[in-house]
From Swiss-Prot:
Repeat keyword on record: no
Keyword Nucleus carried by entry: yes
One GO location term (cellular component): GINS complex
Name this protein carries in UniProt: DNA replication complex GINS protein PSF3
Primary role: Functions as part of the GINS complex which plays an essential role in the initiation of DNA replication by binding to DNA replication origins and facilitating the assembly of the DNA replication machinery.
Native species: Saccharomyces cerevisiae (strain ATCC 204508 / S288c) (Baker's yeast)
Subunit and interaction comment: Component of the GINS complex which is a heterotetramer of SLD5, PSF1, PSF2 and PSF3.
InterPro entries reported in the protein's UniProt record: GINS_A (IPR021151), GINS_bundle-like_dom_sf (IPR036224), GINS_Psf3 (IPR010492), GINS_Psf3_sf (IPR038437), PSF3_N (IPR055221)
Lineage, broadest ranks: Eukaryota, Fungi, Dikarya, Ascomycota, Saccharomycotina
A single BP term in Gene Ontology: mitotic DNA replication initiation
Anything else known: Present with 2205 molecules/cell in log phase SD medium.
Origin superkingdom: Eukaryota
Family note: Belongs to the GINS3/PSF3 family.
Alphabetized UniProt keyword annotations: DNA replication, Nucleus
Subcellular location: Nucleus
Amino acid sequence: MGYYDIDDVLADGTEFPCKFQYDIPGLGYLENNPGRPITKNTKLSLPLWLARILAIVGGDEALVDEEPVPFVELLPPDMFSTKVMNAIKTDPVALDLHSINSHFFSLAIKWIMLFSEKELANVVSELLLQRAQELNHHASSLSIDLNADSTGKNSANTNIATSTFLLKLEEMEKEIYKKSHESYKDTKRWMFKK
């Protein structure tokens, strides 16, 4: 991940629910009220790159002893809800992460870093481990000829199962699958040349 990584840019553009903790004049256009203020306790969805800054930067510094209250409070998004976490714990491999969010792992890492959520970190680590094993299985089951299975015989079922599995992957997993598959193909080519 980095400044020029398009997936990181797209992940940072994902909108997260926020609650404003101040009345802010002139920002009414964010809720389709140009020229009006945003009032305290207004809930809006903001892109993560903006919400993260506003959630860290404090507003009014009334007392020296107190920490300044940030402009917004980041609210937990639906992708980290109890319902989704239970689905992950139940069957991490069968879960369609792409339908939850196409940059699930990137956003989970960013959320964990922001809030030091150990429980979420444990769930996401286990999810990645389980899905990585399945990714490896699918990447290794394809031979050099995409119309043949690992025994060299044509197998439409292998390709259909892999295609269905690939549709459920989020972007980081797709990249891992691609690299793993290319590595297996290169290894098989090398072994056949010997």
